[in-house]
Amino acid sequence: MTASIEEIRQKISDEQFEFSKHAVDQSISRNILVREVRESIANGQIIEDYPDDKYGASCLISGLTEDKRPIHVHCSYPTRPLIKIITLYEPSLQRWNDDFTQRISN
């Protein structure tokens, strides 16, 4: 099974999500607002899929905020009652391509 961006967007829109402690800490230290998480998911795409992640199936979403800030959101599949936001960050051009959708091989 793979995650559906439409299902994730719907759950985010319906307030059916929660942040892990790690994601809360990262959002504070990286100055990423909940509004920006919502915007990046609404405008984003799934760029990596982790169906066998040790804590449960998850995926990585890359999207832009309304201010065009790139944000990556690692979250659980929408099969859970609440989507878990696992971590989030602003991707770096040192590790990602120009549109932040593919990792750069070293």
Put a short name on every predicted segment:
Residues M1-N106:
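Ribonuclease/tRNase effector modules and their secretory precursors
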